[in-house]
Amino acid sequence: MNFYQANLAILALVNACFFLYRHRPRNHKPCHRSTQEDEPKEVIAVRFQRQFLLVYTLVVAADWLQGPYTYAVYKYEKQLAEQTVALLYAFGFVSGAASAPFAGQLADHYGRRTACVAYCVCYGITCLAMLSYNLKILYVGRFFGGIATTLLFSVFEAWMITEYHLSRLEETRVSLCTVFASMTTISSITAVCSGVLGDGLVQYCDSSLAPFLASLGCCIGAGIFILAAWRENYGSTETCKGSPESQTLKLRMLVTLVNPQVAALVFASCCFEGSMYLFVFFWPAALGSARVKSGYQDDLPLGLIFSSFMCAMMAGSSISTTRNALFSNSITMDTLSFIFIIASAAFAVSTMLGHEHLLFWAFCVIEGCVGIYFPRMALIKSNVVDDSVRGGVYSTLRLPLNIFVVVVHSLDRDGQGPSKPFHFPRIQ
């Protein structure tokens, strides 16, 4: 068993221990007798969680399935120049930034469930566009891909939180904290499984386009289930364009965005998630450079390393649900600040490490921080943003992040590491 296999086994064991701890038998002493009304509400809560997480699994699978192969299809199957590939990637981020200010507002007005279906349609168009060799169609695909990414990180969460509140599930055992942590864990597991499935499809079909068709299937399945099982919710009901209620809603959104707490969240998410995006793009080159300096010439086991990172992130999401950290919003704020410090220290240390194995461990710490960050940030946003403007605010929060990523990527230059990038989509 080599170094990376041993680390993956240890991280998998740690996650197994967390799983057993979270699902251990408990002897609850109820403070009141359960009534006939309590039991149906618990059933409704469990059904709500399962219905949402099933759809969420499909939509993140659609994202993860195609991510590792986008660059390969552009560069090697379609024989596009490196500069053209870079422009296609940048166009997707620009599209996401341009759609951020209004995508969520439209979701609030026309319905979050409708917006979730729109994500499936947009991402389906992105997958179909990859089958074409026409450069204009490829740009159209990236355009819809940017919109889909904005919708993925805003409307699904907005629908879930609002539906949770409308169903009055706060008193059940299914807490928002649990749902947020499950989302991060599912994203990690789906990433690993999608990587294995995608590789198998490529080998079986002898084409890097096969994962995009599988991704299209996930979008179709998610869209059908949303229409069949989800009910619609809105940012505000019975508001017409130009009406006083509509103006009040716009004012409420503006007040929310200029709220110091929300402004702090915008800055924090831009810095942390922006750094995360850059890390996703550049960790293979960093580890590859360290390996070359160590005198090794064989290729990195990128699949094992990526699986280890996902296990580290799963462990972080499990830590985020520990009992002592879920009850107080101030505790959540303090924990998030502590995570920023740890992640910053890990990034700083990684720039000074020349040993491949030490660098890998520093990267695992960063991924663990990512696993803690997303459930905590989601919990804070659910508390400070009103349901009536949640979709619009959530999508607008992604505007600075997309601008940051586009600007930084326009300034990056190749270093001494491997020249061929290894692209994954997102980490949530």
Over which residues does each language-model region extend?
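Symmetry-related core transmembrane helices of the 12-TM Major Facilitator Superfamily/SLC fold
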Residues: Y4-C17, S187, L209-A228, P421-Q428
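Helix-loop junctions on the cytosolic side of multi-pass membrane transporters
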Residues: L20-P30, D199, D206-S208, S215-P244, ...
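Juxtamembrane intracellular "pre-TM" segments in multi-pass secondary transporters
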Residues: H32-V46, W230-A268, S289
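Substrate-agnostic recognition of the 12-TM MFS/MFS-like secondary transporter fold
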Residues: Q51, V55-A72, V85-A107, G111-T114, ...
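Short amphipathic helix-loop junctions that connect adjacent transmembrane helices
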Residues: A62-Q83, F281-L300, S350
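Cytoplasmic membrane-interface "Motif A"-like loop-to-helix N-cap segments
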Residues: H109-C120, A325-F340, S419
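C-terminal ends and interior cores of transmembrane alpha-helices
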Residues: V121-L138, I341-G354
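C-terminal transmembrane helical hairpin of 12-TM major facilitator-type secondary transporters
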Residues: S330-F374
